[in-house]
């Protein structure tokens, strides 16, 4: 039996986490030749490789190394570098998830008439200033099959004119992800490692460009962290994206001792 040749594209750590069990199932299938591609749009060891290691996911088959100096340059590099790979591999199907720049790989796939499957389709925030809103709309409308997490997402796509036979509600793969890794989560010693008491700490993740690169928003974020620390006197663990760390270092930010900036 001829195997279906499927390319899956990832580029960010949330995609890697959410697709971890899907990719494992695709790898295990006797009916599928699964090819995993990493765009390399922010290929930093702490942000990506550690997730492949910790989640037990194999190394990608191909890296696009598409990182650019700007978001626009990165998108351009992704489109330019995926196309010759598609020409070489000649896949039967193409899978992307979500709304980051990596999902725009679907554009060259569409031009080559490769069937596109889009997971996490139909999500909308209705804020055109958000770059991901543009990405998700583009990919939703060029995909052959949109896999939604909810009835609401499905309804959004129907209202935008997509035919019902191109939309399948699957639910979120995070259910399988959490169930699979639950023993590891329960066995984790992270609380003792960080000297934290259960239920008496805060976890913060804030790395979006509009929050970090905007001086007023960034200063407001730091002020909020200090106020929360002062009010509750609990440790605040901040998962610190490189963009956030660069801003902290460049501004020589001062925070209360309860605030800890840790690697993601």
Show which residues each predicted segment covers.
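Active-site and donor-binding regions of nucleotide-sugar-utilizing enzymes
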Residues: 7-10, 16-25, 51, 63-163
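Donor-nucleotide binding loops and adjacent catalytic segments primarily
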Residues: 41, 49, 186-264
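N-terminal subdomain of nucleotide-sugar transferases
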Residues: 1-41
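N-terminal beta-loop-helix "entrance" segment that forms/cooperates
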Residues: 42-58
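Cofactor-binding loop segments of dinucleotide-utilizing enzymes, especially the Rossmann-like FAD-
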Residues: 11-12, 39-41, 121, 172, ...
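Structural beta-sheet core signal
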Residues: 8, 36-38, 96, 118, ...
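A nucleotide-sugar donor-handling region in carbohydrate enzymes
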Residues: 42-46, 65, 142-217
């Amino acid at each position: 039996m001829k195997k279906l040749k499927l390319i899956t594209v990832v580029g960010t750590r949330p995609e890697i986490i959410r697709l971890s069990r899907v990719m494992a199932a695709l790898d295990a299938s006797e009916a599928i030749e699964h090819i995993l591609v990493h765009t390399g749009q922010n290929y930093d060891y702490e942000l990506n490789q550690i997730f492949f290691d910790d989640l037990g996911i194999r190394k990608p088959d191909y890296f696009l190394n598409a990182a650019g100096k700007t978001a626009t340059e990165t998108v351009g590099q992704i489109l330019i570098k995926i196309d010759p790979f598609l020409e070489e591999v000649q896949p039967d199907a193409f899978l992307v998830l979500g709304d980051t720049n990596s999902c725009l790989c679907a554009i060259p796939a569409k031009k080559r008439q490769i069937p596109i499957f889009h997971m996490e389709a139909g999500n909308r925030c209705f804020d055109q200033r958000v770059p991901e809103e543009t990405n998700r709309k583009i990919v939703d409308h060029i995909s052959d099959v949109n896999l939604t997490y909810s009835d609401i997402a499905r309804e959004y796509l129907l209202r935008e004119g997509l035919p019902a036979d191109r939309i399948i509600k699957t639910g979120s793969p995070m259910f399988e992800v959490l169930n699979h890794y639950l023993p590891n989560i329960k066995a984790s010693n992270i609380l003792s490692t960080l000297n934290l008491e259960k239920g008496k700490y805060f976890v913060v993740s804030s790395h979006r460009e509009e929050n970090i690169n905007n001086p007023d928003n960034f200063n407001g974020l730091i002020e909020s962290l200090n106020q929360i620390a002062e009010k509750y006197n609990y440790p605040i663990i901040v998962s610190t994206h490189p963009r956030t760390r660069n801003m902290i270092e460049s501004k020589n930010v001062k925070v209360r001792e309860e605030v800890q900036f840790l690697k993601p």
